[in-house]
Amino acid sequence: MKPPMQPLTQALPFSLRDALQGTGLRVPVIKMGTGWEGMYRTLKEVAYILLCCWCIKELLD
C-alpha cells in the first residue's frame, strides 16, 4: 500500500501555502487583509509568482 502523499502546499512558501489552503482544486486564492496590508501582501505574492515564471523562462531559453 502506498504511503499517504503530502499536499503540495507544504512544499511552497508560507504565503502561497496560506493562499492555497482551503481550496478543493489547490489553486491560488487571493486573501485580502485589512486595508493596505492585504494589498501589499497580494502584490508581494504576485511579484513572487512573476519572478518565478521569469526565472523558469530564462532557464528554458
Curated annotation (Swiss-Prot):
InterPro entries: LEP503. It holds the Pfam family LEP503. It comes from the Eukaryota. Preferentially expressed in the lens epithelial cells. This is Lens epithelial cell protein LEP503.
